Amino acid sequence: MALLKSRLLVGVARCQPCLAAVQGRASSWWSHVEMGPPDPILGVTEAFKRDTNSKKMNLGVGAYRDDNGKPYVLSSVRKAEAQLASKNLDKEYLPIGGLAEFARASAQLALGENCDAIQSGRFITVQTISGTGSLRVGANFLQRFYKYSRDVYLPKPSWGNHTPIFRDAGLEVKGYRYYDPKTCGFDFTGALDDISKIPEQSIILFHACAHNPTGVDPKQEQWKELAALIKSRRLFPFFDMAYQGFASGDTNRDAWAVRHFIQEGINVVLSQSYAKNMGLYGERVGAFTVVCSDAEEAKRVESQLKILIRPMYSNPPLNGARIAAAILTQPDLRKEWLQEVKGMANRIISMREQLVSNLKKEGSIHNWQHISDQIGMFCFTGLRPEQVERLIKEFSIYMTKDGRISVAGVTSANNGYLAHAIHQVTK
């Protein structure tokens, strides 16, 4: 009996550290952390995956698909990859500012090779971690060095990530009217009215082309008026250009607004992404450009951008930048890429036109002209949340509650089904 009691006491003693560990875990450092809300777009994808309907459609995710609904890798990208693989290149770190030939080629693509800022060297472009990284580098740079205002005005609505990017960088996010739900088009009058009241020297963000999420872009004459107003109000423009070439199929046309502002003597900052127009989603290829007053100022800005980037991510990824640089700088690859970009843009334009035509064939009495008037990957359909809910439940057509669809997810095979479903929930 004494031996059994002794063994029990030893066993209890051995368990004391375990009990202490359990108690320690119970009083975790992170017990106060609440569950964050799910990403609305990723939530759409998860629901789509669970659906067993053979006709289901995922119109939530902003990634291009071919007319068979499959991911599309550009031929120019494949050729650039093969070319790079044959060179047996190293995998050394890039400089903080990224691959120099990529950065310069990106600036030339956006601003135009004959742009005065390019010719005089009064710009600096750094490679970034796609468009999101570019926006964050830009936001941090403005937070630290733009001494005139802490307010950044975004179009209403804007890409969902814009607000947290600028807010988390320490800037105050505000808005100006942009989309008119009555016309499903650009609220030009409202935009001019709001912008005219923005305090001078505030920061204002524009989507250079293919506005996300509405697909609504100003016309060139409207851009001219906006530029004149920005200049007279002494506002600071931040352009986000994630879809150059992907909107109209013409890289020069899609960059028109940015180039016009610079021609008018307005120095801008610019974010670029190659996720959509080169299909380099997972490679995370982007650029951030600051147009300066002179070359000496550009050098000072470059030095501070490097200081910002170093503790953020040290240096950007190598492989995607090499691919993009090869495409942008080699005439044969560039020519093929421009044709492929135009092909992707044209497929999306065609899907828009077919959808409008199919809705008419269904007998819809509503005006769906805005679907073909809008541009780029996304379309604001004008559908109400309860109509979207019916599309999901009755037809397995998935989209965000605001009625935004990714036209890239529409194909020749399912266009008619989509039109039929939309007609059923709107008639």
From Swiss-Prot:
Gene: got2
Organism name: Xenopus tropicalis (Western clawed frog)
Main subcellular location of this protein, as a coarse class: mitochondrion
Class of this enzyme: transferase
UniProt-recorded name of the protein: Aspartate aminotransferase, mitochondrial
Record's catalysed reaction(s): L-aspartate + 2-oxoglutarate = oxaloacetate + L-glutamate; L-kynurenine + 2-oxoglutarate = kynurenate + L-glutamate + H2O
Record-linked CDD domains: AAT_like (cd00609)
Superkingdom to which the source organism belongs: Eukaryota
Primary role: Catalyzes the irreversible transamination of the L-tryptophan metabolite L-kynurenine to form kynurenic acid (KA). As a member of the malate-aspartate shuttle, it has a key role in the intracellular NAD(H) redox balance. Is important for metabolite exchange between mitochondria and cytosol, and for amino acid metabolism.
InterPro entries attached to this UniProt entry: Aminotransferase_I/II_large (IPR004839), Asp_trans (IPR000796), NHTrfase_class1_PyrdxlP-BS (IPR004838), PyrdxlP-dep_Trfase (IPR015424), PyrdxlP-dep_Trfase_major (IPR015421), PyrdxlP-dep_Trfase_small (IPR015422)
SUPFAM superfamilies given in the database record: PLP-dependent transferases (SSF53383)
Residues given in the record as substrate binding sites: G62, W159, N212, R404
GO BP field: 2-oxoglutarate metabolic process; aspartate metabolic process; biosynthetic process; glutamate metabolic process
Assigned keywords, A-Z: Aminotransferase, Mitochondrion, Pyridoxal phosphate, Transferase, Transit peptide
GO cellular component, one term: mitochondrial matrix
Organism lineage: Eukaryota, Metazoa, Chordata, Craniata, Vertebrata
